Swiss-Prot record:
Keywords: Cytoplasm, Phosphoprotein, Phosphotransferase system, Sugar transport, Transport
Gene Ontology cellular component list: cytoplasm
Coiled coil: none
InterPro entries for the chain: HPr, HPr-like, HPr-like_sf, PTS_HPr_His_P_site, PTS_HPr_Ser_P_site
Function: General (non sugar-specific) component of the phosphoenolpyruvate-dependent sugar phosphotransferase system (sugar PTS). This major carbohydrate active-transport system catalyzes the phosphorylation of incoming sugar substrates concomitantly with their translocation across the cell membrane. The phosphoryl group from phosphoenolpyruvate (PEP) is transferred to the phosphoryl carrier protein HPr by enzyme I. Phospho-HPr then transfers it to the PTS EIIA domain.
Segments forming domain HPr: 1-88
Family as reported in the entry's similarity comment: Belongs to the HPr family.
Compartment(s) where it occurs, according to its Swiss-Prot or TrEMBL record: Cytoplasm
Lineage: Bacteria, Pseudomonadati, Pseudomonadota, Gammaproteobacteria, Lysobacterales
CDD domains documented for this protein: PTS-HPr_like
Catalytic residues, chain numbering: 15 (pros-phosphohistidine intermediate)
TM spans (from-to): none
Pfam families: PTS-HPr
Protein name per the record: Phosphocarrier protein HPr
Amino acid sequence: MLEHELTVTNKLGLHARATAKLVQTMSKFQSNTTLSTKGREVNAKSIMGVMLLAASQGTVIRVRIDGEDEHTAMQALSELFENRFNEDT
């Protein structure tokens, strides 16, 4: 199991388009992935769950990934956050 903290840095936070990219990315992996912040924990493969986090710019999200492809999944998710969901260019 891997745990890591990622910060939402894109201007609009985890809005619908960014959430869809996150869910699509994580759905490619078999590992179970949860995101938590502000006392809420959700499945990273659920659009509604991720939207419920209401994560705005600057929000720190704890990521927990468990499974065979956890390292690859964490790398993909980290890159998505680092690239600001390819929005703030």
